[in-house]
């Protein structure tokens, strides 16, 4: 149910990829178009960047600080998963510029989570979120998905209740999409999981959540994102939707600049080949209409 960048890895592959990503950042650092800009938001998305080793995360974050002309009130989001919220990683992220965490909870309900391949039970999810919040050094937002197999309206309300109780600064509520050929689609087709909710039922779940959050003073920042504190600015998403210049770095990254939309190579091998040859690893460059 995720159509974003996905690749398997091991430590050697990870080390080499981060080497190339840093090389790409360093190669762009002195370009006039980037050097003369001010970067207000950095979004390290995925994939699952929190899976990086502490050493590689530190190297990457320090390269971002060195190579990009960051505004003094910049937002630096690290996207990730609950399972990675361990002290040896948290300490590195927060000491090296991360000031916003976006985490894929999907559901707090243990059985629902396990059905879609999530490792941690409800107690662990809440414990790890609390561990991050106790640092008091970044905005914390989570993703919840509605329409998951076995997730009825009662469980959905429990998810929303736990969202409030968790104390996070905001949340994205996403409708489940089941892609043809995906593991989730196969599990449903084979009877291993119950069907996902219908579109009509999902619409009811969204309407319920909208009313539920509005009654609890949550602010709706865009069609699917809510904030409950001034700490959560959702700056990257706001700027992206406003047509601001976006500089892409890393395999599969997309951007837009001076009337052109860009996509960097999604496959690791050509991405690394172009970077090591001293070239920007464009897969596509299209003039915006």
Predicted feature locations:
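Local cysteine-cluster metal-coordination motifs and their immediate loop/turn environment
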Residues: 1-6
